[in-house]
């Protein structure tokens, strides 16, 4: 039983990487959205998800105070991110979809700007939109996500048109 204030350790099952998930940039991005998405009460695919990220991955969330003025970066390692997000994702039936992307690649490294929309099945409402920035590297055999940085859309900070679906 967890004590008051303790964070639950989310278990991560061992899994082998799927070739279709890690052989291309497009594949790894598709998989990253699939693994965190699911219905209310449906466990997330954390074993599969873990195979996408480098052992030393960092997640960085950009946070604004209630007035929208002060901006801070919150950094998580892999387990911290799961521990903080799993309950919400499962309880609310969170689903995140990619809206558009821009890939910049040089040799074995790539940066991807990927716009997203997050919806909760419990209410059917869109609860977040923004841009994920993925830093990836290719080790000669497969792609790895090294960092994932994101910022949410606001009225003052809309998603750029080039990262939205064409009308």
Question: Where are the language model's segments positioned?
Answer:
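Short beta-strand edge/turn micro-motifs at domain boundaries
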Residues: 1-8, 111, 129-158
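Short, well-ordered alpha-helical segments enriched in acidic and aromatic residues
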Residues: 42-66
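Surface-exposed, charged secondary-structure patches
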Residues: 67-122
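A short, polar/proline- and glycine-enriched secondary-structure boundary/capping micro-motif
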Residues: 70-73, 122-126, 154-162
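A short gly/proline-enriched turn/hairpin at secondary-structure junctions
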Residues: 17, 37, 57-73
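Hydrophobic pocket/interface hotspot
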Residues: 32, 49, 57, 112, ...
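Short, low-complexity N-terminal intrinsically disordered segments enriched in polar/charged residues
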Residues: 1-51, 164-167
């Amino acid at each position: 039983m967890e004590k008051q204030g303790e964070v639950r350790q989310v278990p991560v099952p061992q899994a082998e990487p799927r070739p279709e998930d890690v052989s291309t940039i497009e594949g790894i991005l598709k998989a990253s959205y699939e693994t965190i998405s699911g219905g209310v009460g449906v466990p997330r695919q954390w074993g599969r998800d873990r195979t996408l990220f480098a052992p030393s991955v960092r997640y960085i969330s950009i946070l604004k105070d209630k007035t929208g003025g002060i901006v801070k970066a919150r950094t998580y390692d892999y387990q911290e991110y799961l521990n903080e997000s799993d309950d919400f994702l499962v309880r609310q039936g969170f689903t995140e979809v990619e809206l558009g992307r821009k890939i910049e690649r040089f040799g074995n490294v790539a940066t991807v700007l990927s716009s997203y929309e997050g919806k909760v099945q419990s209410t059917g409402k869109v609860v977040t939109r923004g841009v994920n920035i993925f830093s990836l590297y290719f080790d000669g055999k497969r792609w790895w996500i090294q960092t994932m940085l994101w910022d949410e859309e606001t009225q003052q900070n809309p998603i750029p048109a080039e990262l939205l679906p064409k009308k």
